[in-house]
Structures are given as C-alpha cells and as structure tokens.
A protein has these predicted regions:
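Membrane-anchoring alpha-helices and their flanking helix-loop junctions
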Residues: 2-187
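Active-site acidic catalytic loop and adjacent metal/ATP-binding pocket
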Residues: 190
Length: 190
C-alpha cells in the first residue's frame, strides 16, 4: 500500500510535466507510423514476435481501464466526492463495454494479435488510469454544485452521444460483416 501512495505522490507532484510527456508520445508515434506499419488488424504480422488470440489480447490490454481504476478508487475511496464518483462510474461503464462486451460480439474468431501490441496497450492503459485517478482523486476538487453546472451537463451529453455513436457503429459494422462476409466493407447511412 505504501508503494501505491508513493506512485500517486510522484504523479501528483509532477502531474503537468508527466502529462506533457504523455501528450508528446502520440505525436511522436503519429510520425513514426509513417515509416512503420503497426502489426494489428489487416496489417497483422509475425515480425513483431509471438501472437495471441485477438479477443483475449483485447480483453487483457483494456482490463486496467476497468479493474485498475476500480481498485484504486476503492483503495482511495476517502478521496472520492459525489462528482468524482460519477466521473469514475462513467469511465468504468464505457470501458466495461469496450473490455468485456465488445470483444465477444465482434468477429475475432481465429484472429491473432502480437503479444507485444497487447503489452504496449496494457501499459498505455495503466498510465491512462494513473492520470485519470491522479486528477480525479488528488488534484480536482469538484463541489456538488458542479452536478448542475453547464460544463458537467454538456460533458454528460457529449459522453452519452459519443457512447451511442460508438456502440451503434460497432453493431453496424458487425451486422455488415454478417451480411457480406469477412473483409472490409464501407457502411452506408447511420
């Protein structure tokens, strides 16, 4: 438990520096991927080491976004306000679907994923959870009046809209594959 507290002390005291580095990583990766093809999906490759079942790779790589954030919020529950609890529950709701529902409705039978890709995504999600928890549990101070504020209501509306679009799009693509078979198809309409 002391180690967990030390990690959050480090994150809290260096939050904006670490966040700046975290934001720089995808910018660097964006340019890097002009020269290297990521070995995932239709570009899957054995050049990146051993592979694993894509469904289980997905579940493993996304799992910190459900279980780690839940565990940390239980561990630091004294730091949770009503508003921050709502933020965490929304976050877990989204990632519960992405982690434990989507992989079982998506067509992934027989597909493989490099273990290295699953590992990198797993590490990414650990850091993402640490940033989210550091902000929600230690830095932000949301009073209950925030629940009726314009930014909160707008944020909830954006989340609900985005979640709906995301899930509906998933099901559209899944149904398109069922109707037209394997391969890549462009959906029409929404």
């Amino acid at each position: 438990t002391r180690g967990v507290v030390m990690v959050f002390d480090l994150f809290t005291s260096n939050f904006y520096l670490l966040l700046s580095i975290w934001i720089a990583i995808p910018i660097i990766t964006f340019f890097y991927l002009f020269f290297v093809t990521a070995p995932y999906g239709r570009h899957a490759s054995t050049n990146w080491g051993p592979s694993m079942d894509a469904r289980w790779g997905w579940i493993v790589m996304e799992s910190p976004s459900v279980f780690l954030i839940g565990g940390l919020c239980i561990f630091f529950r004294a730091n949770l306000s009503s508003v921050s609890l709502i933020f965490v529950l929304i976050y877990i709701f989204h990632y519960f679907h992405r982690t434990l529902i989507w992989p079982f409705i998506a067509e992934m039978d027989g597909k493989k994923m490099p273990v290295f890709v699953a590992f990198l995504a797993f590490v990414f999600n650990i850091f993402n959870v640490l940033f989210q928890c550091t902000w929600i549990l230690f830095i932000a101070n949301y009073e209950n009046s925030w629940l009726t504020s314009f930014p909160f209501i707008l944020g909830i509306l954006i989340f609900v809209s985005g979640f709906y679009i995301n899930v509906r799009s998933d099901y559209m693509l899944i149904n398109l594959r069922k109707a037209k078979g394997p391969g890549y198809h462009i959906p029409r309409g929404f």
